[in-house]
UniProtKB/Swiss-Prot annotation:
Converts alpha-amino-beta-carboxymuconate-epsilon-semialdehyde (ACMS) to alpha-aminomuconate semialdehyde (AMS). ACMS can be converted non-enzymatically to quinolate (QA), a key precursor of NAD, and a potent endogenous excitotoxin of neuronal cells which is implicated in the pathogenesis of various neurodegenerative disorders. In the presence of ACMSD, ACMS is converted to AMS, a benign catabolite. ACMSD ultimately controls the metabolic fate of tryptophan catabolism along the kynurenine pathway. One of its GO terms (molecular function) is zinc ion binding. Substrate binds at R47. This is 2-amino-3-carboxymuconate-6-semialdehyde decarboxylase. The lineage of its organism: Eukaryota, Metazoa, Chordata, Craniata, Vertebrata. One of its GO terms (cellular component) is cytoplasm. Zn(2+) binds at H6, H8, H174, D291.
């Protein structure tokens, strides 16, 4: 069994959001040829996607070809829209979550849903989380690595974490809103470097901000192998010990204490990196994730895990499915 914790999906269509809300900045999907569509922001194309981004039957066909049993589906992070008026973001979240739920209901043995929330308005986010869990049956939600000017240690977000803990709602943290201009404008640097940096900041913010200390039952998984964190945790821990005046303002516990307290996906594209990741984060805490259907993802799901001579079969099976089930609070028999 292979369970992919990290895959993205969009509705086939949605209303003109600029017309609906009266201002720009929204993302639209424009179908321009058979099996292909443009993602537009304020009329400018920023990505072309194929039908596997919105058509579940095409997706299942490709999953079968690659041996993927189940995908956890989440929206494309550019849809988060935390910058917008909260009620408008909530409206969009409801649209996305309802569409996602209909896909999951149609194929319950192949898909699980991770909802999206208006995180810039924590009260609304909690209400939509409750709806996602209680009405739509989602085991978790996807959130961004920051919410406008808030990092994930922001006290304003603590009610969201409290609700997630109470509802047993898992959080999948995905980078977004990277710097795109200036020094980052060339070489695809926002995706190659900016995304791992975003994720590293998110992990450090949650650790040093006391989130894992205050909410010990919170289940969190960070995308892209936890960014640079697994490789730099020694530096982070040493710096914490040397400058507690700067690093221990909100939590006196050394960051290394929290290794094993959270999950990451296994999307690192390199055997040495995957070995380090499992050594640092824990073999029980790393989950197959592909970033399907995008080109920076793992094009042969599970191939890297299966190639690891250092891993016994039990470890490989944990990374391919068991750890995902534990993170999501689901049982294998639901998908067999």
């Amino acid at each position: 069994m292979k369970i992919d914790i990290h895959s993205h999906i969009l509705p086939k269509e949605w209303p003109d959001l600029k017309k609906r809300f009266g201002y720009g900045g929204w993302v639209q999907l424009q179908h321009h040829s058979k099996g292909e569509a443009k993602l537009l922001k304020d009329g400018k194309v920023f990505r072309v996607v194929r039908e596997n981004c919105w058509d579940p039957e095409v997706r299942i066909r490709e999953m079968d070809q690659k041996g993927v049993t189940v995908q956890a589906l989440s929206t494309v992070p550019v849809m988060f829209s935390y910058w917008a008026k909260p009620e408008d973001t909530l409206n969009l979240c409801q649209l996305l979550n309802n569409d996602l739920a209909s896909t999951v209901v149609s194929y319950p043995r192949r898909f699980v849903g991770l909802g999206t929330l208006p995180m810039q308005a924590p009260e609304l986010a909690v209400k939509e989380m409750e709806r996602c869990v209680k009405e739509l049956g989602f085991p978790g939600v996807q959130i961004g690595t920051h919410v406008n000017e808030w990092d994930l240690n922001a006290q304003e977000l603590f009610p969201v974490y409290a609700a997630a803990e109470r509802l047993k709602c898992s959080l999948f943290v995905h980078p977004w809103d990277m710097q795109m201009d200036g020094r980052m404008a060339k070489y695809w640097l926002p995706w190659l470097v900016g995304m791992p940096a975003e994720t590293t900041i998110a992990i450090c913010s949650m650790i040093m901000g006391g989130v894992f200390e205050k909410f010990p039952k919170l289940k969190v998984c960070f995308a892209h192998g936890g960014g640079a964190f697994p490789f730099t945790v020694g530096r982070i821990s040493h710096g914490f010990s040397m400058r507690p005046d700067l690093c221990a303002q909100d939590n006196p516990m050394n960051p290394k204490k929290y290794l094993g307290s959270f999950y990451t996906d296994a999307l690192v594209h390199d055997p040495l990196s995957l070995k380090l990741l499992t050594d640092v984060i824990g073999k029980d805490k790393v989950i197959l994730g592909t970033d399907y259907p995008f080109p920076l993802g793992e094009l042969e799901p599970g191939k890297l895990i299966e190639s690891m001579e250092e891993f016994d079969e039990e470890t490989k099976n944990k990374l391919k499915a068991g750890n995902a089930l534990a993170f999501l609070g689901l049982e294998r028999k639901q998908f067999e």
